[in-house]
Design a protein with these regions (language model features):
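Short, acidic (Asp/Glu-rich) active-site segment that either coordinates a divalent metal cofactor
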Residues: 117-131
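Short glycine- and Lys/Arg-enriched binding-loop motifs that mark or flank ligand-binding interfaces
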Residues: 33-38, 98, 103, 120-122
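Short, glycine/acidic-enriched loop or turn micro-motifs at the edges of active sites
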Residues: 10, 35-36, 100, 127-129
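N-terminal lobe of the biotin/lipoate ligase/transferase fold
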Residues: 1-88, 106
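Acidic (Asp/Glu) carboxylate-rich active-site/surface patches
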Residues: 81-116, 126
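Asparagine-centered polar/low-complexity signal
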Residues: 13, 52, 96, 128-131
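Solvent-exposed residues in well-ordered beta-strands and their adjoining turns
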Residues: 58-62, 111, 128-130
């Protein structure tokens, strides 16, 4: 998997969409700050520089749209597992939000690249490590 580390970006998901043709089958982009982070249904993801883990993963090897949407569940459960290993008790507000002590600390946004068939899946994760 190719790793791309950036200081600042509009959106890690949007970056992967723009660069799709130039990237290998799997890629991950991280940024210290996003200027236009977003969640589902166009909700704004507020973030401050160096206070969040911001990353998006590109997987080009999806061919069925129904499999692509399972990535939300997989990513959400993976973050819960990571937090559990650090003894942080978190809960899931399905389908894509993670809470600790009643505060949202993580959002996951899965998007597809269609042209016109499914060409890839992008999984964006924003984790507020200071909440």
């Amino acid at each position: 998997m190719k790793l791309i580390e950036l200081e600042e970006i509009d959106s890690t998901n949007d970056y992967l969409k723009r660069e799709y043709q130039n990237l290998p089958m799997q890629a991950c982009v991280t940024a210290k700050y996003q200027t236009k982070g977003r969640g589902r249904n166009g909700h704004v993801w507020e973030s401050h520089a160096n206070e969040n883990l911001i990353m998006s993963f590109l997987f080009k090897d999806f061919h069925k749209i129904e499999d692509a949407w399972k990535m939300t569940q997989l990513a959400t459960c993976s973050v819960i597992g990571l937090l559990d290993r650090h003894r942080i008790k978190a809960t899931i507000k399905w389908p894509n939000d993670i809470y600790v002590d009643g505060k949202k600390i993580c959002g996951i946004l899965v998007e597809t690249i269609l042209d016109p068939d499914l060409k890839g899946v992008i999984v964006g994760i924003g984790l507020n490590v200071n909440n």
